[in-house]
Amino acid sequence: MEEETHTDAKIRAENGTGSSPRGPGCSLRHFACEQNLLSRPDGSASFLQGDTSVLAGVYGPAEVKVSKEIFNKATLEVILRPKIGLPGVAEKSRERLIRNTCEAVVLGTLHPRTSITVVLQVVSDAGSLLACCLNAACMALVDAGVPMRALFCGVACALDSDGTLVLDPTSKQEKEARAVLTFALDSVERKLLMSSTKGLYSDTELQQCLAAAQAASQHVFRFYRESLQRRYSKS
């Protein structure tokens, strides 16, 4: 279910540490990002949110198998690999959500009959994994030079038993939460690109979570900008 209503939300602050662009009113965990750290992909990025870490590699635009070829745009594929073992139902579901988000911003019509593949490797999962995957994918796409109409980011929210909203929840907070909601938002209009929800919540709470995620996305996009400025100012 998708809502784009802007509503004020009361947010419980979680103290964060590390290099991130947060102000005192933002409760996201610390961020860290490193790009161009893999040699084989066309672009790569490692994204850290608290103790959750994801490594992303982007291949393409490249040749595509005839069976997967789309005549008027690029074929976009997302592969998510868990930390241990083989991909299961949860990974396949996240792959679909991430692919839908990427397809909403990637200008695939500029590279018809090609493939763009995003490979994500979970390094550690300490909560808000889907949001971290989205952020890693975006920074890897930027590193690969894939044309996009906007950047995107993921923000997760948890609602505890008394209705308190927690942004960027840890694994413990997710387990104790009544509901966990993850949103993908673009950098131009803070437009909702994708939502994934689990648990019980009211329409009002959904709107509150979306409004909180839209506000928090400003901090994520500021971190993107400062991270890219630091990287390219060195080169």
UniProtKB/Swiss-Prot annotation:
Q: Which organism is it from?
A: Homo sapiens (Human)
Q: Which UniProt keywords apply?
A: Cytoplasm, Disease variant, DNA-binding, Exosome, Intellectual disability, Nucleus, Phosphoprotein, rRNA processing
One of the protein's GO biological processes: U4 snRNA 3'-end processing
Q: Which PANTHER family match?
A: EXOSOME COMPLEX COMPONENT (PTHR11953), EXOSOME COMPLEX COMPONENT RRP46 (PTHR11953:SF1)
Q: Which domain of life is it from?
A: Eukaryota
Location in or out of the cell: Nucleus, Nucleolus; Cytoplasm; Nucleus
For region Disordered, the annotated ranges are 1-24
UniProt lists the gene as: EXOSC5
Per the similarity annotation, which family is this?
Belongs to the RNase PH family.
Function recorded in the entry: Non-catalytic component of the RNA exosome complex which has 3'->5' exoribonuclease activity and participates in a multitude of cellular RNA processing and degradation events. In the nucleus, the RNA exosome complex is involved in proper maturation of stable RNA species such as rRNA, snRNA and snoRNA, in the elimination of RNA processing by-products and non-coding 'pervasive' transcripts, such as antisense RNA species and promoter-upstream transcripts (PROMPTs), and of mRNAs with processing defects, thereby limiting or excluding their export to the cytoplasm.
Q: Which residues carry this modification: Phosphoserine?
A: S20
Expressed, tissue-wise, as follows:
Highly expressed in a variety of hematopoietic and epithelial tumor cell lines, but not in normal hematopoietic tissues or other normal tissue, with the exception of testis.
> What name is this protein filed under?
Exosome complex component RRP46
Q: Name one GO cellular component term.
A: nucleus
* Reported impact of M148T: In CABAC; uncertain significance; no detectable effect on interaction with EXOSC3, EXOSC9 and EXOSC10, when assayed in a heterologous system
| Subunit composition and interactions | Homodimer. Component of the RNA exosome core complex (Exo-9), composed of EXOSC1, EXOSC2, EXOSC3, EXOSC4, EXOSC5, EXOSC6, EXOSC7, EXOSC8 and EXOSC9; within the complex interacts with EXOSC3, EXOSC8, and EXOSC9. The catalytically inactive RNA exosome core complex (Exo-9) associates with the catalytic subunit EXOSC10/RRP6. Exo-9 may associate with DIS3 to form the nucleolar exosome complex, or DIS3L to form the cytoplasmic exosome complex.
